[in-house]
Amino acid sequence: MTREVFQHSSVMPEEVLECLRPQPGEVFVDGTVGGGGHARLILEATAPDGLLVGLDRDREALEEAGRQLASFGERVLLRHGNFADATRILAELDIATVDGILLDLGVSSFQLDTARRGFSFQSDAPLDMRMDTSAGMTAADVVNALSPEELARIFREYGEERYARRIARRIEKVRADEPLMTTRQLAELVRDAVPGGHVPSRIHPATRVFQALRIHVNAELDSLREGLRRSLALLKPGGRMAVISFHSLEDRIVKQFFRSEVQTCICPPGLPICACNRKPGVALLTRKGLKASESEIAANPRARSAVLRAIRRL
């Protein structure tokens, strides 16, 4: 099979470097290395002897990163795995702490554009959506096995879909005759199920359902919560972490986690004086989430929804 071209534009590259400020000789983790775009920038900034550990759940992305970053030789170490497992992976490499961590969340352009991965409804493909195609349930498994109540919960919580129950009931009805196995089947089902689904619109009516299924299949929000907690523990004092999110659910988790680590007193409101003596663990490097510039969005429309937040460990 001919190798597909891995096209992925790294989002907000200048802003990422400004937040992380990589220096020569430092050690970084790119927890979602993808095609290696951000990783290359970090490796260039940490030359001549800096080290980058690149992680990714997607083996195809990891293979592409290996090709793109081959010129850096032993300065880059690539490992297959979820960034939530970074502590274990770094321990295997005898690395206890690092100077910086980058998490670029969401689906890469390559994953969206590769029809057989099943992330997009733009073409007909198997309903898969797994980041790691070697493990776990596919999106087809989910829509054909779960109860309509559970499906509605997934669509509502992970996709913020207002017609969650209606879509779930339609799935239950359709799958009774034949299983839903392709992206086109599901996209057309959603279009038929929701009011105005066939009215031309900039946003496809199945967008939120596909997002919700992808998040559920890959346990993305649970991985993010665990990954943030473990990543912070890996940072040296003064170390920096930057996170790029692409939808409100992710950004809310990142924002709340960072704010909780900045907090000082966590005593109950009724106490007259502070008794916890808690000191903040981090300093915010971004008071508000940073957004891509208009010029970047014009060149890379997928950057429109990106939000960058960063912290420095105290």
From Swiss-Prot:
Belongs to the methyltransferase superfamily. RsmH family. InterPro entries: RsmH, SAM-dep_MeTrfase_MraW_recog, SAM-dependent_MTases_sf. One of its GO terms (molecular function) is rRNA (cytosine-N4-)-methyltransferase activity. Gene3D superfamilies: Putative methyltransferase TM0872, insert domain, Vaccinia Virus protein VP39. It catalyses: cytidine(1402) in 16S rRNA + S-adenosyl-L-methionine = N(4)-methylcytidine(1402) in 16S rRNA + S-adenosyl-L-homocysteine + H(+). Keywords: Cytoplasm, Methyltransferase, rRNA processing, S-adenosyl-L-methionine, Transferase. This is Ribosomal RNA small subunit methyltransferase H. Pfam families: Methyltransf_5. It comes from the Bacteria. Specifically methylates the N4 position of cytidine in position 1402 (C1402) of 16S rRNA. SUPFAM superfamilies: Putative methyltransferase TM0872, insert domain, S-adenosyl-L-methionine-dependent methyltransferases.
